[in-house]
Amino acid sequence: KILKVLKKFKVEILSSGGTYKKINRLGYKSIEISDFTNSPEILDGRVKTFHPKLYGGILFKRNNKKHQKQIKKIDIKKIDLVIVNFYPFEDAVKTGNDKKIIENIDIGGPTLVRAAAKNYEDVTVITDTNQYIALQNEMNKYRGSTSLNFRKILSRDAFLETGYYDTKITEYLNKANNDSPPPKKKLIGGNLVENLRYGENPHQGASVYSLNKEINIKQLNGKKLSYNNYNLSLIHI
């Protein structure tokens, strides 16, 4: 569906590796990043997106005349939309294979996301397939573009995504180095389980997060839980 809306608004697509092959296999046109940058992937794919043509196109400020002159001089095209799915690091951890785990630490993806999120005034960044429908609606509403408010929300979500991803890498490395002194900083990354009926007081909002992707609590009956209901449930457990 996302490819359909991109085609509808004549968006030129850049992609790499397996994504490039899949897009073309589905019958849509895309340009391989190595062709766009004129720089091949190296080190078994470890280096494929680090190039000024990409980061310049993402990071330059559209209303900055100095930036405009620089990108024109070195022939950099603007990049208005960045869509990235990170390597499945958490799934790799479950295998227990250290080599596989290390190779699934995504470097290029989070870097692209952070660049796009920093320049949210001009760039839309997508980090979750659940955001595709919202993006499609925005592009249809704004004739191929998106609103600033939408981009700001996505920027926040993008930094949450990279922060969570780094937290999981840190957790793995902490467990792999049990004999080392405790780290000076501690990161905690959680996933939203559900939004509660209200917080400690009826006028407050509340949500439940889990350190894992799922939480082993099942509500058998009754209305939706509030913050106080959840606290009492956990106490009784």
List where the protein language model places each region:
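Internal alpha/beta core interface subdomains
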Residues: I76-Y198, H203-G205
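Glycine-rich nucleotide/cofactor/substrate-binding loop typically near the N-terminus or early
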Residues: G18-F89
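Catalytic, metal-anchored helix/loop core of enzyme active sites in primary metabolism
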Residues: R62, I107-P110, Y230
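Gly-rich Lys/Arg/Thr-decorated short loops/hinges at beta-loop-alpha junctions or inter-strand turns
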Residues: K48-Y55, P88-N97, A116-A117, K213-Y227
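N-terminal phosphate-binding or glycine-rich loops at protein starts, especially the Walker A/P-loop
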Residues: K1-E32, E121
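Conserved small/polar residues in nucleotide/adenosyl-binding loops
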Residues: I235-I237
